[in-house]
Amino acid sequence: LNAAERIGPAMLSIYPKQYRSLLSVRDTQVAIKAIKDWFEVSLAQELNLTRVSAPLFVRPETGLNGNLNGVERPVTFTVKGLGERQCEVVQSLAKWKRFALKKYSFHPGEGLYTDMNAVRRDEELDNLHSIYVDQWDWEAIIDRKDRNLWTLMGYVRKIYKALKQTERRLIQAFPVLETYLLDRISFITSQELEDAYPELTPRERENVHARKKGAICIMQIGGPLRSG
């Protein structure tokens, strides 16, 4: 059997034909760690976030495991010390973060972030998606009067600023790398995308507009479009 037959096509990494890594394998690992550290500091400062520890697994009856689209199966196991009661590896911290904001007595304008580790057994695998998730996850309390488009855009700009700050430090540490992010991020709604590119699929619209603008935030995702 060849590699594709042994592990299946979904497990293979796909590289552009002209791809060539600018860093050695070792420097790539150093850069990954540096990016994670620098972005953590910048994100916390920009959004006024406090780091908290998150669970790796929870009991099903707590209702704190995020169920994503509602069809993904969590990884489950029993714990001897709990009388063989069942636990689930977290798939999402969406519910837990809201619980934690209340538990730790956060106030409007404040928030938390955590180093989320999760296992998603039903994830569709490709270059960007893995069954193992390791990501910075955050949540903030927004006063009801501030829950509007301008607040959303403000948060996006702050996150993008943190990304730019991280990129700047990365290039200083590894001069062989080049600037990738534009100075500003642009905004567009999903309906505006459909109006601009009616002949394309939703994914194609995103790709075309991202290539055109360089850095985009798509808003109002999930609501019905005029096309139905």
Model segments located where?
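Structured aminoacyl-transfer and RNA-binding surfaces used for tRNA recognition/handling
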Residues: 5-228
